[in-house]
Amino acid sequence: TSGLGRNFRYPMFRLLSRFLSNDIAIDLGTANTLIFVRGKGIVLDEPSMVAIQSGAGNKSKIMAVGTEAKKMQGRAPRNIEIVRPMKDGVIADFVITERMLGMLIKKATEGRSLVPPRVVICVPGGSTQVERKAILDSAFAAGAASVHLIEEPMAAALGAGLPIEDAAGSMIVDIGGGTTEIGILSLGGMAYS
């Protein structure tokens, strides 16, 4: 295998990578994408939008992502299209989502990471295996060393400091830009979603 990202052969490199890489949590939403970096908090909260310039021979170029793409909405020339690659909390356009994620991760880490980041991404509770694989593949293609998925209600409960390990249930209502999820958590897992 190549690189310092996916599979280290030497324990020393694994240990070193923990100190050099960024641990990132991503809420990849229909309306906005938030990125949390360990030790820094939320470093990015931008619209899940991409400005794409059409080129000759079906070649396109990403002109802007996030806030910069939103600023172009309604003002861009005809050859630049503003798109939202996420629909109802899941990936609608894999290639554009991958490129958007890569650019937002680079922006959030200020392009300084020596080792690819370890990433946790929130996914809708009702997402299919195919949709989850698309998110995983997109994050790896964007340069992540490792990717873990967590259901949005579970992430919300952890963020709110709820006692998710207790036998008593905790109810979460996650109202997003494209979906609303309700989850009941008990004994460290989702009892209902």
Listing of model-derived features with the role each one plays in the protein:
Residues S2-G177, G183-S193:
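Nucleotide/phosphate-binding catalytic cleft detector across ATP-hydrolyzing
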